[in-house]
Design a protein with these regions (language model features):
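Alpha-helical transmembrane segments and their helix-helix packing motifs
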Residues: 1-168
Length: 168
């Protein structure tokens, strides 16, 4: 979101924006896969019982969503994540930052919006337990990821940039 705002303001190129997206995405994917496998599957947290059942149920629900609803869900999700970041940036102290981040994140989770990086944990966790496939994961990741980009880059950074640029 910060890099897209910089791209709108021509402080960085759109090529740099895309490069940043690629690096950040793969770093988050590797971290999420590591946590899902080692702390979920290997340690056994998602290997049996209620945690296994829940992670599979959640993942199956996410991968069952068609392309357009997943895309729109991704937009809504990252719109709330972007709002959380802006509220955090504007807060004067740690308590304000916590409150500013807590409510938008709580709302997107309660609504059931999809975030590509959160899905990079929960869907592979279900894959490691036999609940869904890697193909299901990729088919979910593409629309959610694209929606997250639109939600954060256009609905947060773009709206902020253009309202400030033309509002003053």
């Amino acid at each position: 979101m910060a890099v897209s705002l910089s791209a709108f303001a021509k402080k960085v190129s759109w090529i740099d924006f895309v490069k940043n997206l690629i690096v950040i995405t793969f770093a988050n994917l590797i971290g999420a896969l590591f946590v899902a496998y080692f702390f979920g599957h290997f340690v056994g947290l998602t290997h049996s019982g209620i945690f296994r059942d829940d992670v599979i149920r959640i993942a199956q629900s996410k991968v069952a969503s068609p392309f357009m609803p997943s895309f729109v869900s991704g937009i809504g999700c990252n719109w709330f994540v972007g709002l959380a970041l802006w509220l955090s940036y504007g807060a004067k102290d740690a308590a304000g930052k916590i409150v500013g981040v807590w409510f938008p994140i709580m709302i997107f989770v309660a609504i059931g919006f999809q975030h590509s990086i959160a899905n990079c944990f929960v869907i592979p966790a279900a894959i490691f337990e036999g609940g869904v496939t890697w193909g299901d994961f990729i088919n979910n990741l593409i629309p959610v990821y694209l929606g997250n980009i639109v939600g954060g880059s256009i609905f947060v950074s773009g709206f902020y940039y253009f309202s400030y640029k033309f509002g003053h």
